Amino acid sequence: QEKLDEKKKFYVDSGQPAKFYQEYMMEVQSAEDSIFNMRHINYWDGMFKTDGDFAFLQIDGQEIPVNPYLGVDPATDSERRESDYSVIIAIAVDENNTVYVLDYLRQRGLPVLGIPGEEKKGIVDHIFEYNSIFKPRITVIEDTTMSRPVFQSITSEMRRRNDFSVKAKAEKPGTRMSKRDRIQEIMAQRFAIGAVKIKKSHYDLQHEIITFGSRM
């Protein structure tokens, strides 16, 4: 795994992440079908810090005030859990509405809650961890039938932990547009003007961005 990570870093640093996934992960993507390409990728390099209720980024010696947020897309039912990824993403937004990706979790096989006494954590355990680190203004969770156990577990865990700081909000995905159309309408404009920035270490996220579209 370490050698594979080194090869992934080499291809990402050379501006050819898709080549890594094509050669080593057997994933092929048509560039013509992709919504985004490497020109849409903008990086940021710095630190996220909090001081009480105040959050800011330290970039090139400057402190940039930001509002942190958490987004959660759970795959928690028994059928989806092993095939689909559960995702938690932490972002920060500055006064110019620029989005900085702080960190993310992308993992298959996540239960709603981990079993006490065992190392494996559930998605709710990770939500509390991310909430403690980034202190998001709000945690948005996609509101589906499958996510309802997540909300129930957050409520019960807040009581058990005596920690009521998670500000969870349900967000319905909507049915008027497909996910691809929603991304094209909302995210493509942000990427086009450089209003979304990720870190160079976000290999999997970069891959998801530049290969979003139909597979060959």
Model region roles, listed by residue range:
Residues 13, 17, 81-84, 147:
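Active-site-proximal structural scaffolding
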Residues 56-64, 78-82, 129-133:
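Short, conserved, surface-exposed binding loops centered on an aromatic residue
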Residues 68, 81-84, 116, 120:
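Hydrophobic alpha-helical segments and helix-packing faces
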Residues 1-10, 27-31, 35, 94-215:
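Mg2+-dependent endonuclease catalytic cores in nucleic-acid-processing enzymes, primarily RNase H-like
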Residues 70-71, 90, 140:
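Structured core elements
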Residues 72-88:
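An active-site-proximal beta-strand-loop segment
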Residues 1-75:
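ATPase catalytic-site recognition across NTP-hydrolyzing enzymes
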